[in-house]
């Protein structure tokens, strides 16, 4: 068992314990820069018939970090070795922090995942193969994944925005946190590395909705 798998199991056990002790507390996870690809773009970058290789399960059921990596190339710079998340989607999307966007010269547009109309494009590369996206670069709006049962218990609904208190050595309250409800989800809040740095993020950190 590798370290990432062990951390995932620990997070799940902590969630069970915290859920039993305090129903309104949930795990907070920090997401680094990453890419979602369509099947067409996977084949364009890695070869015809190519399938992503799962390397690590993510906290959301069925989602995984793939072994494959890409270059994200902007007007003023690029990031190499950017992780691809699977499975393939119906649209390609690049998720960066605002700091990342400034570094490579791309406009940072804060959006819910999947809401890519009107967002900047970017060039993706693997070796001598490239894919030009005409849209799809977003700064992910901070959000909480939950089931319908979780939403009922926490008195929130899909698409609502809430305030979340972060329990850490640098406690703060995040405003405008999006609620995303689907029964295939597992309860957890997702923030990016800029947000994680602002609250002194550590693995296993928790949050709760402020009423």
UniProtKB/Swiss-Prot annotation:
GO terms for molecular function: acyltransferase activity, transferring groups other than amino-acyl groups; metal ion binding. Phosphate binds at residue 89. CoA binds at residues 30-32, 76, 197. It is an enzyme of class 2 (transferase). There are 2 Zn(2+) ions per monomer; Zn(2+) and CoA bind inbetween the 2 domains in each monomer. Zn(2+) 2 binds at residues 143, 145, 190. Involved in 1,2-propanediol (1,2-PD) utilization within the bacterial microcompartment (BMC) dedicated to 1,2-PD degradation by catalyzing the conversion of propanoyl-CoA to propanoyl-phosphate. Formed by 2 beta-barrels, each is capped on both ends by short alpha-helices. This is Phosphate propanoyltransferase. The gene is pduL.
């Amino acid at each position: 068992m590798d370290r990432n798998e062990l951390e995932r199991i620990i997070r799940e056990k902590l969630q069970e314990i915290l859920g039993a002790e305090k129903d309104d507390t949930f795990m907070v996870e920090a997401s680094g820069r990453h890419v979602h690809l369509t099947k067409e773009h996977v084949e364009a970058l890695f070869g015809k018939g190519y399938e992503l290789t799962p390397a690590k399960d993510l906290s959301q059921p069925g989602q995984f970090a793939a072994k494959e990596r890409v270059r994200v190339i902007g007007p003023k710079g690029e990031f190499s070795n950017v992780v691809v998340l699977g499975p393939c989607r119906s649209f390609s999307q690049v998720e960066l922090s605002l700091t990342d966007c400034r570094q490579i010269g791309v406009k940072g547009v804060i959006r819910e995942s999947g809401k890519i109309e009107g967002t900047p494009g970017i060039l993706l590369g693997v070796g001598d193969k490239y894919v030009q996206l005409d849209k799809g670069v977003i700064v992910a709006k901070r959000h909480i994944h939950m089931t319908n049962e979780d939403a009922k218990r926490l008195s929130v609904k899909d698409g609502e925005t809430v305030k979340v208190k972060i329990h850490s050595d640098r406690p703060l309250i995040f405003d405008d946190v999006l609620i995303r409800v689907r029964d295939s989800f597992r309860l957890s809040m997702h923030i990016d590395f800029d947000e994680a740095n602002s609250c002194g993020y550590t693995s296993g950190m928790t949050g709760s909705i402020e009423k």
